[in-house]
């Protein structure tokens, strides 16, 4: 029996969780949520930590981009798959997220697009492959 991959969704918008949890669980993922960076940091100290992050860039207690930079500096999370969920349109910020190794999905997004990006992030499908 394989263990479900654990996704930590870091987003302060409650409706994101209401929409994503049932959809992602139906796809076989275990899902937990953090609404602040402080909650996300605590969740990342859990044993075992999440297998991947879905990360908003704008959170009430700071920048998701700064959090991503911090993750990349730590040995245990330097290669953690991260998918940035954002309505951000500023190219400089999006380029920095990509430079830090994050995949991007812009809000609003379709569930199909999200599931494809997650599968690509884990290497289950290649870009351009059907799901």
Stretch-by-stretch model annotation:
Residues 33-52:
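Acidic, metal-coordinating helix/loop segments flanking the phosphotransfer/catalytic sites
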Residues 35-36, 63-66:
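Acidic catalytic/metal-coordinating carboxylates
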């Amino acid at each position: 029996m394989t263990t479900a991959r654990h996704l930590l969704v870091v987003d302060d918008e409650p409706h994101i969780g209401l929409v994503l949890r049932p959809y992602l669980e139906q796809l076989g993922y275990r899902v937990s949520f953090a609404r602040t960076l402080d909650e996300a940091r605590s969740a990342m100290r859990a044993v075992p930590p999440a297998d991947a992050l879905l990360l908003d860039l704008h959170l009430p207690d700071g920048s998701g981009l700064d959090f991503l930079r911090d993750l990349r500096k730590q040995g245990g999370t330097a290669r953690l798959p991260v998918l940035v969920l954002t309505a951000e349109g500023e190219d400089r910020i999006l380029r920095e997220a990509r430079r830090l190794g994050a995949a991007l999905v812009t809000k609003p997004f379709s569930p199909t697009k999200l599931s494809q990006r997650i599968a690509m992030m884990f290497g289950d499908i290649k870009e351009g492959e059907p799901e």
